[in-house]
Each structure stands twice: as C-alpha cells, then as structure tokens.
C-alpha cells in the first residue's frame, strides 16, 4: 500500500475516532459496546456509524432494517 494512502487513512481514522472534546468530529456518535445510544438518521461515511444532531444513534448502520 502506498505510504501516502496509509497516512491519509490513519489521519481520517483518528479524526473520526477522537472525541469532540479532543478536537475530533463534533457529530461523532458516543458508542456503548459498539452500539450508538439513540436512533440515527444519517450514516457517518467514514466510521460506518450513524449519527444524529443530538445525541447519537442506537446501532450500526449495517444492522439497520432497510
């Protein structure tokens, strides 16, 4: 794998998984045991988790029915 691609993926991963308090994405879901806390509306394209304005979702997008 190209080093630049690997670096970019690492940066994106850290951005998505860093809590908002530490400068991560503001809309990142807070998960408990891999599941988000509240029903979601919009899928986070980077992490695969769904997100909502406040607070976040209840389960992964892949587990959504329809």
Swiss-Prot record:
GO CC term, one of those recorded: sperm midpiece
Propeptide position ranges: 61-66
Tissues in which the UniProt entry reports expression: Expressed at low levels in kidney, lung, and spleen.
Region forming the signal peptide: 1-23
InterPro entries: Beta_defensin_dom
Role, per record: Has bactericidal activity. May act as a ligand for C-C chemokine receptor CCR6. Positively regulates the sperm motility and bactericidal activity in a CCR6-dependent manner. Binds to CCR6 and triggers Ca2+ mobilization in the sperm which is important for its motility.
Name recorded for this polypeptide: Defensin-B1
Organism encoding this protein: Ornithorhynchus anatinus
């Amino acid at each position: 794998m190209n080093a630049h691609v690997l670096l970019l993926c690492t940066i994106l991963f850290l951005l998505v998984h860093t809590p908002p308090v530490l400068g991560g994405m503001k809309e990142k879901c807070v998960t408990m045991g891999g599941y988000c806390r509240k029903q979601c509306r919009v899928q986070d394209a980077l992490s695969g988790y769904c997100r909502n304005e406040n607070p976040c979702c209840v389960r992964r997008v892949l587990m959504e029915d329809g």
